[in-house]
Design a protein with these regions (language model features):
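N-terminal active-site segment of His-dependent metallophosphoesterases
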Residues: 1-80
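Active-site neighborhood of phospho(di)ester-bond hydrolases with catalytic His/Asp-centered motifs
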Residues: 13-15, 65-71, 97-104, 138, ...
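Short, solvent-exposed loop/turn segments at secondary-structure junctions
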Residues: 17-19, 73, 106-107, 141-143, ...
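Extended active-site neighborhood of metal-dependent phosphoesterases/phosphodiesterases
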Residues: 24, 29-37, 75-172
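His/acidic metal-ligating clusters that form di-metal
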Residues: 43-66, 92-97, 134, 148-189
Length: 189
């Protein structure tokens, strides 16, 4: 990332793309006939096209960052290296620098999936500063006994220790934004 303190930037937040290697009907207007498009094609031609248009609408030189809030992919039938490559290419096809939080569908309770995600996107727990904001991105999706993830989200003791150390080094005048995939509470609690 560029050095120095930015006083103004834009953060585009992407929620739950869940791009799959499956095919589904998508419509672009009520008059369209249903056509089959892959999720990757839909994400590239619709979602990323909208993001690129948003970036073009900003004043020239505005720093732009993206933050995917997890579930970049949805695996059906096991890990899919081609799908990972395609979503990385799609997400990297604009001028924005992208950060990504891991979601439950990015790992599906499999150590292999989590390792592959880390190889492709980086660590599952990290932080960065932009302007006067300290962003903390953390994995809060854990699977129990290889089964479905537990909701609400939770943190492991090692993460709490890391978070305390991270925040201790953060200037007290900075805002802190905690980024994670699933809610930490049930309902209205």
């Amino acid at each position: 990332l560029p050095g120095g303190k930015e006083t103004s930037y834009k953060m585009i937040v992407i929620g739950d793309p869940q791009v799959t290697n499956a095919y589904s009907p998508y419509y672009t207007s009520p008059d369209d006939n249903p056509i089959k498009k892959s999720d990757v094609e839909r994400f590239t031609t619709q979602t990323m096209a909208d993001i690129k248009q948003t970036i073009r609408s900003l004043p020239a030189g505005t720093p732009v960052y993206g933050l995917s809030m997890g579930d970049d992919v949805q695996y059906y039938g096991g890990y899919n290296a081609k799908l990972e490559r395609q979503i990385r290419q799609a997400l990297g096809s604009s001028e924005m620098r992208l950060f990504s939080v891991i979601g439950n569908h990015d790992q599906d309770g499999k150590a292999l999936y989590r390792r592959k995600w880390e190889e492709n996107f980086g660590p599952t727990d990290f932080s960065f500063n932009r302007g006067d904001v300290h962003y903390v991105c953390i994995n809060n999706c854990f699977f129990h006994h290889g089964m479905a993830y537990y909701s609400p989200g939770e943190l492991r003791e090692r993460q709490v220790k890391w978070l305390r150390q991270d925040l201790a080094l953060t200037p007290k005048d900075m805002k802190v934004v905690l980024c994670y995939h699933i809610p930490f509470t049930f309902g209205n609690a």
